[in-house]
């Protein structure tokens, strides 16, 4: 009887090797695990519509100028404003003057200086005002944008200096000025120094008027408090984005004070157009064309007066 050839114990048989984890399964396992592994998703990939709760791709919102399918004009920062307002998105960023920070050494549980640091980190802006210079509808213009993301767009010394710097730039270049407003009011951390900016910005607007240079205001959501009581309502023409809250005190404060229910849409831009406080409600995508047309007409009238 023939004897079976002894098997090399080092090699073993194929099945034994596979059972020990050296077969085909071990070769494909990494790929299988990779296919089903949890993938990292960017946190800001989606944005929730505040009206409908719908989740919207951030890229789609950016393409729509941050207007939701439901028509909500969402709050946006200076860079986005500049890019769609200026012709071909081309503009020169103008500096805002530095100011003394935290002169009152204010703290409301958190030091004011710490709040400034946090706001700058979140927005990438030195304060609530940003200035750009370029062409709007073919007309040279200085554009000022108030950033609500920076401490509620509040009006403080830096914001006041920013507004005055924009007005000076318009005067030096003899061009019109556009202001996009968005604020909760004066910056409480600066006390009376903040309230002073209401008078200072008003004087800057008077200089524009004395030079017969157009000053156009675009009221965005929200524009309230001391900003409404000063430069936001001193324009030659007032445009407003749809649904923007515009007023001095907020509706809840008013209701609590007068103890009456306010009418629907009270203090919204559409309501204010009906009452004559705003000249026109303009969709964000139409703003560049409308602004360009207004500036062209106003500057043409200025040239005729000069002649």
Curated annotation (Swiss-Prot):
Keywords of this entry: ATP-binding, Cytoplasm, Fatty acid biosynthesis, Fatty acid metabolism, Lipid biosynthesis, Lipid metabolism, Nucleotide-binding, Transferase
Reactions accelerated catalytically: N(6)-carboxybiotinyl-L-lysyl-[protein] + acetyl-CoA = N(6)-biotinyl-L-lysyl-[protein] + malonyl-CoA
Positions of the UniProt region annotated as Disordered: 1-26
Domain CoA carboxyltransferase N-terminal: 45-307
Pfam families for this protein: Carboxyl_trans
Leading EC class: transferase
InterPro entries: AcCoA_carboxyl_beta, Acetyl_CoA_COase_Trfase_b_su, ClpP/crotonase-like_dom_sf, COA_CT_N
Subcellular location: Cytoplasm
Protein's job: Component of the acetyl coenzyme A carboxylase (ACC) complex. Biotin carboxylase (BC) catalyzes the carboxylation of biotin on its carrier protein (BCCP) and then the CO(2) group is transferred by the transcarboxylase to acetyl-CoA to form malonyl-CoA.
Molecular function, one GO term: acetyl-CoA carboxylase activity
Enzyme Commission number(s) from the entry: 2.1.3.15
Domain of life: Bacteria
Protein name per Swiss-Prot or TrEMBL: Acetyl-coenzyme A carboxylase carboxyl transferase subunit beta
Any one GO CC term of the record: acetate CoA-transferase complex
GN (gene name): accD
Family: Belongs to the AccD/PCCB family.
Annotated PANTHER family: ACETYL-COENZYME A CARBOXYLASE CARBOXYL TRANSFERASE SUBUNIT BETA, CHLOROPLASTIC
Positions with biased composition (Basic and acidic residues): 7-21
Chief subcellular location: cytoplasm
GO biological process assignments: fatty acid biosynthetic process; malonyl-CoA biosynthetic process
Signal peptide (UniProt feature, chain positions): none
């Amino acid at each position: 009887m023939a004897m079976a050839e002894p098997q090399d114990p080092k090699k073993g048989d194929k099945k034994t090797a596979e059972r020990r984890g050296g077969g085909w399964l071990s070769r494909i396992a990494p790929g299988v695990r990779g296919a089903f592994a949890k993938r990292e998703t960017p946190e800001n990939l989606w944005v929730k519509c505040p009206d409908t709760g719908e989740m919207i791709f951030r890229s789609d919102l950016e393409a729509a100028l941050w207007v939701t399918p439901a028509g909500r004009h969402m709050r946006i920062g200076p860079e986005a404003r500049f890019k769609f307002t200026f012709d071909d998105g081309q503009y020169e960023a103008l500096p805002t003057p530095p100011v003394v920070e935290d002169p009152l050494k204010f703290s409301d549980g958190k030091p004011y200086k710490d709040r400034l640091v946090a706001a700058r980190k979140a927005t990438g802006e030195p304060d609530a005002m940003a200035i750009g210079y370029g062409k709007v509808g073919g007309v040279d213009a200085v554009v000022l944008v108030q950033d609500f993301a920076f401490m509620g767009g509040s009006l403080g010394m830096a914001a006041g200096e920013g507004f005055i710097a924009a007005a000076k730039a318009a005067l030096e270049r003899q061009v019109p000025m556009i202001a996009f407003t968005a604020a909760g009011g004066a910056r409480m951390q600066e006390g009376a120094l903040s309230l002073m900016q209401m008078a200072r910005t008003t004087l800057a607007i008077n200089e524009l008027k004395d030079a017969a240079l157009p000053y156009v205001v675009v009221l965005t959501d929200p524009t309230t408090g001391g900003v409404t009581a000063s430069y936001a309502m001193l324009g030659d023409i007032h445009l407003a984005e749809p649904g923007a809250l515009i007023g001095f005190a907020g509706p809840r404060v008013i209701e609590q004070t007068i103890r009456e229910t306010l009418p629907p849409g009270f203090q919204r831009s559409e309501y204010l157009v009906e009452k004559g406080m705003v000249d026109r409600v303009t969709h964000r995508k139409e703003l560049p064309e409308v602004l360009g047309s207004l500036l062209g007409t106003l500057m043409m009238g200025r040239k005729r007066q000069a002649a």
